[in-house]
């Protein structure tokens, strides 16, 4: 049976389903093909359920580490299985919302694996819609990414990726997390607050190595205080799953001495690579980059007419909100509607939802000076310890830091670590996107008392006149 659509979206993750909705809003007949996760990794086993677990962990942290601060008396126990059950319910609710949106926008759901026969035809295998042939005018590839692993390390029952970990309702007693990026550090926060003996091994010289160095220091201090062991500057050289226990060999960089940890479980979190295999992409003529991602232009167009790509498979910046933004550009381009390209992906915001939270975009001071050696770069940092709302919340760790051009006040980067940093960064993203200067940000009246006043104060600092510090 052959069906024809104006637009077919391959993959129902955050980029895929958003692009489908936008295309349908613009009058296109749209179908989405998905083999497993409607809402993608993000809604099912990533962003959404992990935030539920983190909230539970924050509550546990308050009762176990801050009892004296808040006058809490008596003993309270925390059940990880109950926290896990809540996270699955949260995920199910949000995924149900995706199906509702498909129906609301008259988008056809096709359940199965879409395989390209050629640049205008997809064949569905697996799933309840296996056997269908789908033709299209335009196709948006939103197939996401797959996890990397360490050389010589295979996933097994006790050596897992984030996906197996987040689906497991049982917390181990002792665990190693390989990789101190956002995912590794979020899981370390959750499990550490549920009494798991967690060790994080990171090859780079600090945790969250892609963030500002001072941000990394704040996070490292908070985690050590919480009892999480951090081993930055160490290489994981071998992982052996012995059934009842796992052995992890590691070496400090520059040393020949091998040490071994024996734990119940190991989670490997060392990044992702674009998912470009397993769906017949080679039958389309679509070109890949040297990194193995689908090559696109500013409008998400590939080199093949009528085929677009968005999200992790493009490797521009592998974040759900970036995929969503790309999806809207792709849909509007297909429909011939007015759109706005995304510009420099360096200026896209990112966050790590540990506690304190981390968020950033743009350049660090060092990066800015290296990129613009002839420009005077100014940096201002305002500590949350000087922010009244943060003091009232007893969440005074961290700071709001702004990197700017001294002459024009152009916003070149922002780096936040502290309470609700993921919410505070968006004001600065908007300002950067619309070319507001740091002076204009500082002159915008902010409600008192709020955490966002720290952002205003940092902007004042670029001009040399912070008020409350």
Swiss-Prot record:
One of its GO terms (molecular function) is dihydrolipoyl dehydrogenase (NADH) activity. Pathway: Carbohydrate metabolism; tricarboxylic acid cycle; succinyl-CoA from 2-oxoglutarate (dehydrogenase route): step 1/1. It is an enzyme of class 1 (oxidoreductase). SUPFAM superfamilies: FAD/NAD(P)-binding domain, FAD/NAD-linked reductases, dimerisation (C-terminal) domain. Binds 1 FAD per subunit. Its main location: cytoplasm. The keyword Cytoplasm applies. Its cofactor is FAD. It comes from the Bacteria. It catalyses: N(6)-[(R)-dihydrolipoyl]-L-lysyl-[protein] + NAD(+) = N(6)-[(R)-lipoyl]-L-lysyl-[protein] + NADH + H(+). GO terms for biological process: 2-oxoglutarate metabolic process; tricarboxylic acid cycle. Its EC number is 1.8.1.4. The keyword Cell inner membrane does not apply. Disulfide bonds join 42-47. One of its GO terms (cellular component) is cytoplasm. Keywords: Cytoplasm, Disulfide bond, FAD, Flavoprotein, NAD, Oxidoreductase, Redox-active center. FAD binds at residues 34-42, 51, 114, 312, 320. Lipoamide dehydrogenase is an essential component of the pyruvate dehydrogenase (PDH) and 2-oxoglutarate dehydrogenase (ODH) complexes. Catalyzes the reoxidation of dihydrolipoyl groups which are covalently attached to the lipoate acyltransferase components (E2) of the complexes. Also catalyzes a reversible NADH:NAD(+) transhydrogenation, and is able to transfer electrons from NADH to various redox-active compounds and quinones. May be involved in quinone redox cycling in C.glutamicum. Belongs to the class-I pyridine nucleotide-disulfide oxidoreductase family. This is Dihydrolipoyl dehydrogenase. It comes from Corynebacterium glutamicum (strain ATCC 13032 / DSM 20300 / JCM 1318 / BCRC 11384 / CCUG 27702 / LMG 3730 / NBRC 12168 / NCIMB 10025 / NRRL B-2784 / 534). The lineage of its organism: Bacteria, Bacillati, Actinomycetota, Actinomycetes, Mycobacteriales. The gene is lpd.
């Amino acid at each position: 049976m052959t069906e024809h659509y104006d637009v077919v979206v391959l993959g129902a993750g955050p980029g895929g389903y958003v692009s489908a909705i936008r295309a349908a809003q613009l009058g296109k007949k749209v179908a989405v093909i998905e083999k497993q996760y409607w809402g993608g990794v993000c809604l099912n086993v990533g962003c959404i359920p992990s935030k539920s677990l983190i909230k539970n962990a924050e509550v546990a942290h308050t009762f176990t580490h801050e009892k004296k601060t808040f006058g809490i008396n008596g003993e309270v126990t925390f059940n990880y299985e109950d926290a896990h059950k809540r996270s699955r319910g949260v995920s199910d609710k949000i995924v149900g919302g995706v199906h509702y949106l498909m129906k609301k926008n008259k988008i056809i759901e096709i359940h199965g694996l879409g395989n390209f026969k050629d640049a205008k035809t997809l064949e569905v295998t697996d799933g309840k819609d296996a056997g269908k042939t789908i033709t299209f005018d335009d196709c948006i590839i939103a197939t996401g990414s797959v996890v990397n692993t360490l050389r010589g390390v295979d996933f097994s029952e006790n050596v897992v990726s984030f996906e197996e970990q987040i689906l497991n309702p049982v917390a181990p007693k002792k665990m190693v997390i390989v990789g101190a990026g956002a995912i590794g550090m979020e899981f370390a926060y959750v499990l550490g607050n549920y009494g798991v003996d967690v060790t994080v091994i990171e090859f780079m010289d600090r945790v969250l190595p892609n963030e500002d160095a001072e941000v990394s220091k704040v996070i490292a201090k908070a985690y050590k205080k919480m009892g999480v062991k951090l081993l930055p500057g160490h290489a994981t050289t071998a992982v052996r799953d012995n059934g009842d226990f796992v052995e992890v060999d590691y070496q400090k960089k520059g040393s020949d001495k091998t040490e071994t940890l024996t734990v119940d479980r190991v989670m490997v979190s060392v990044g992702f690579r674009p998912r470009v295999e397993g769906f017949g992409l080679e039958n389309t003529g679509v070109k890949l980059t040297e990194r193995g991602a689908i090559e696109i232009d500013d409008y998400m167009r590939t080199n093949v007419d009528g085929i677009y790509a968005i999200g992790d498979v493009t490797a521009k910046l592998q974040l759900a909100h970036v995929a969503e933004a790309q999806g809207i550009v792709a849909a509007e381009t297909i429909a011939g509607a007015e759109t706005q390209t995304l510009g420099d992906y360096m200026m896209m915001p990112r966050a790590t939802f540990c506690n304190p939270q981390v968020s950033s975009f743009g350049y660090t001071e060092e990066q800015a000076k290296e990129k613009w050696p002839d420009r005077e770069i100014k940096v201002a940092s305002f500590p949350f310890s000087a922010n009244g709302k943060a003091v009232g919340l007893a969440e005074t760790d961290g700071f709001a830091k702004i990197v700017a051009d001294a002459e024009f006040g152009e916003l070149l980067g922002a780096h936040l670590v502290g309470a609700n940093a993921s919410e505070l960064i968006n004001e600065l993203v908007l300002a950067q996107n619309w070319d507001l200067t740091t002076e204009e940000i500082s002159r915008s009246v902010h409600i008192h008392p709020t955490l966002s006043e720290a952002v205003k104060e940092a902007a004042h600092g670029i001009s040399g006149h912070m008020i409350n510090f």
